[in-house]
Amino acid sequence: MSEEELKAAYDFCEGYKTFLDAAKTEREAVTTAVAMLEKAGYVPFDHAKQYKAGDKVYLNNRGKALIAATLGRRSVAEGVRIGVAHIDSPRLDLKPRPLYEEGEQCFLKTHYYGGIKKYQWTAIPLALHGTVIRKDGSSLSVAIGEEEGDPVFCVTDLLPHLAADQMRKTLAEGIEGEKLNILIGSAALRDDTGAEKVKVAIAKLLFEKYGIVEEDFLSAELCAVPAFKARDLGLDRSMIGAYGHDDRVCAYPILMAEIDEKSPEYTSVTILADKEETGSNGPTGMNSYFLKDFIEDLADMAGCKVRHVAANSHCFSADVNAAFDPIYGEVHERRNASYINYGVVVTKYTGARGKAGTNDATAEMMGFARRILDAEHVGWQTGELGKVDQGGGGTVAMYVSQHNIDTVDLGVPVLSMHAPFEVVAKADVYMTYRAMRAFYK
């Protein structure tokens, strides 16, 4: 990259860090993205209206997933260009009845969300985020632990002096899921002579300060996420360390590409999806029909059939891949690994074992991606998710391609993926943006 490109990359990543800090959950990501879209002139989509080239619309799916689109110069019948990333990340979700007291300390019970190494979530500062729906239907947004002066929370761990039994266990067994309980208080309510005085004190505080009663947990989506901010990493500031790179490091570039591409040849359809980390199910996941329904509305406006639009469309499934880590190089096949600072990584297939659970892009789709990226001088590489039979993973590509849409995975290589603090290179983030601009152009 030239000095000019590097400066552009570093400048671009300042906006990305701001986005990351504002969007630690899928709901916050949608709220932040909608504000960005409306500022850029996007309006809510109305399926009863007719749109023309250059019109910019968005569809908010339950506040947890989002579609943004810019109508292209060509008819929708000739296909659309789809970019999709997911905005959910591994975290600790609160159980429906989370609040309890033990040993005169108050805790919240959790059920971890997504694939985590449980031991990584102990003894780090956590913030509480989410939405509470009260009995009367009113809603309350919660974010405690992010602002200067806010309290933070944590999952405690066993001191090494008493951990002989624990340390004989495997890493997977050392911290049990049922022990990922969040410490939230220890001060008993004064003058209370009843049982569970600390829990009563915390319940009183929740009501007085936040208007939450214990029963409200039954109709809430609350989770614990790392309380730290996105930070430049390395003396050269070439990297970013943060929670939630997977997959907001792709969500932000495709959103910015959508906003910045003012007059695309083909209609651009940008999706920020939920539930990828748990299988893409539910109405806000890519295994639902909300993408198909949106394209069907576009097809109806153009007087064509949705299946014909899908067959003529292409999708870049923007999801991360595992960057080569020299400290753990034995799990990678180096000739087919992705590396930080080598640009956006195009992943033909994911899956496990014999490519189980993968989209496996066609040779024609790979050639299509090559032509687009090379034509715009985008820095790119190919990569697999580790050695054969080492493990595996999946993306939303398989759920898009089931609609007969040619799809390939493309995204940012990540170090320490799924950890509370993941690492990416700024150059790769910017090249992902440039790849999506080239695709939408």
Q: PLM features: what roles do these ranges have?
A:
Residues 1-441:
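N-terminal hydrophobic/helix-forming segments and targeting peptides
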